[in-house]
UniProtKB/Swiss-Prot annotation:
Residues 386-397 have a biased composition (Basic and acidic residues). The gene is ADRM1. The lineage of its organism: Eukaryota, Metazoa, Chordata, Craniata, Vertebrata. One of its GO terms (biological process) is proteasome assembly. It comes from Gallus gallus. This is Proteasomal ubiquitin receptor ADRM1. Keywords: Cytoplasm, Nucleus, Proteasome. PANTHER family: ADHESION REGULATING MOLECULE 1 110 KDA CELL MEMBRANE GLYCOPROTEIN, PROTEASOMAL UBIQUITIN RECEPTOR ADRM1. Its main location: cytoplasm. Residues 198-259 have a biased composition (Low complexity). Component of the 19S proteasome regulatory particle complex. The 26S proteasome consists of a 20S core particle (CP) and two 19S regulatory subunits (RP). Residues 277-390 form the DEUBAD domain. Residues 198-260, 379-406 are annotated as: Disordered. GO terms for cellular component: cytoplasm; nucleus; proteasome complex; proteasome regulatory particle, lid subcomplex.
Amino acid sequence: MTTSGALFPSLVPGSRGSSSKYLVEFRAGKMSLKGSTVTPDKRKGLVYIQQTDDSLIHFCWKDRTSGNVEDDLIIFPDDCEFKRVPQCTTGRVYVLKFKAGSKRLFFWMQEPKTDKDEEHCRKVNEYLNNPPMPGALGGNASGGHELSALGGEGGLQSLLGNMSHNQLMQLIGPTGLGGLGGLGALTGPGLASLLGSGGFPTSSSSSSSRSQSAAVTPSSTTSSTHVTPAPAVPAAASVTSPSPVPSSGSGTSSATSPTQPIQLSDLQNILATMNVPSGAGGQQVDLATVLTPEIMAPILANAEVQERLMPYLPSGESLPQTAEEIQNTLTSPQFQQALSMFSAALASGQHGPLMSQFGLPAEAIDAANKGDVEAFAKAMQNSVKSDQKEGDSKDKKDEEEDMSLD
């Protein structure tokens, strides 16, 4: 089946196909920070940003010689900023600075020409803080940005005029923009007037706008630097979008043939009758309002909890794995935002099969299928209590055996 991404590249200026699997990539080496001085690692490296199948954005650095990926960080919108270090005058040094805590990762450009430096920096910030719409365009790196250009009524009518009813249903279906909040990319005066006063199923589309709303906020870097980097061999970087693929199938409406232009009223009627997932109609629970920093503080003070959470912290140089870092991470605005996004995704009722892959109890999977966040949390809590009872029972049995031996 043709993906909805094939409907757009020919309509949006500048879109093109490519085989690159990364949103943005460029050659750069790592640097180590000691005191107020950064020292370059002379290995040939590659910085790249990738969106995986779970829609998460990864900022990565790998050794180009060995192919080993040494840094793989999951980044949420407004989590960090990538900027040049102006204090360094002997090389082209950039820093990935996290807004929560003191994490900083330094890199030095290995591209021989400087003309793309500013563009690479801009694209890194763009994709980290305004990632492509999850699942909407089959992995198209620039889909969300292209669709935003169609927000005007004229753009929408031009788009619809080139689509058959079959393509339109495909566009707003589960694999197109009808996914969780997918139509948010078309927001604008044109869509507002199109939808009128109630055509949009708000309960099924309220969650994903958070992932598109973050903006880059400049911050300062005060460390002094002494670097003498050496440029390496150039390599081309590209941002990709899919090439048009012809769609097949007959039209689904008897009133309008596939060759007849589609009007805005047609789309309005379809949107008004779209089915909302069963879990989205009930009362939704936002985990971010439950797991507040005040509630988490005494839990995070538990040494056993800290030990269990430590392996899940980001790893890499200049990224300490400490109890303080756990506190900073779980109480950060970015983590709260991630909780809200997870709550909305879970409430959609479409993630039961995904949860089953993690070996969760049947009660939790059933709650995920129903989109019941509260029941999901209770099922997980009951599972932990059951595991604790089994562990306590085993410990008690071992103690009794030891006593009998004495």
